[in-house]
């Protein structure tokens, strides 16, 4: 039986419009893991593992808490606490793993499917800010936000301080294309009616195979360290452009 877990490879683009323009695009890859497949997804892969140290590994404490219960249970509890309804279908996460003992995820997405595994019912977005390393999760009810088949849109107010170069007075417009042969996530930040910032992740699906896993370790030998270095490099560029700095509220 073909696994639902896979690798997504593509590009991440950030575009700041105000108060001054800053734009960049980087190649990226993410793991897309079905939580029911965690026990065997890396079977036979020497450099990849779940629950034990390795070059690349999944470690429970890197993700949504409380971390003393299974991640799948924590996500179902989080959705139920927000909507009063418990998801019963598969849960698949889009994330970075731990590489060479280090993990940092600006955002991980948990896609909660219906019992028949035909559509996404909820998306949990777990965000980690920089440099404080605090976490916050938004729970998005997909059933009420279907724009058209396989497209989901959410608009909501910012509730978590993410970057010192943006204050809290924003609202978000997020657009998701349900994961398939391709995956797309588009996020826009508005202040009143002005578009300040947008980010887009566009990727293509690849099967988890020895060749693909070797390729990503060669092409991105320390993915999460690369993510952090990108964040701080772009922060330096914003500082040079005299973008206002906002203290943590």
Name every feature range the model reports, one short phrase each.
Residues 1-249:
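Mature, function-bearing regions of proteins
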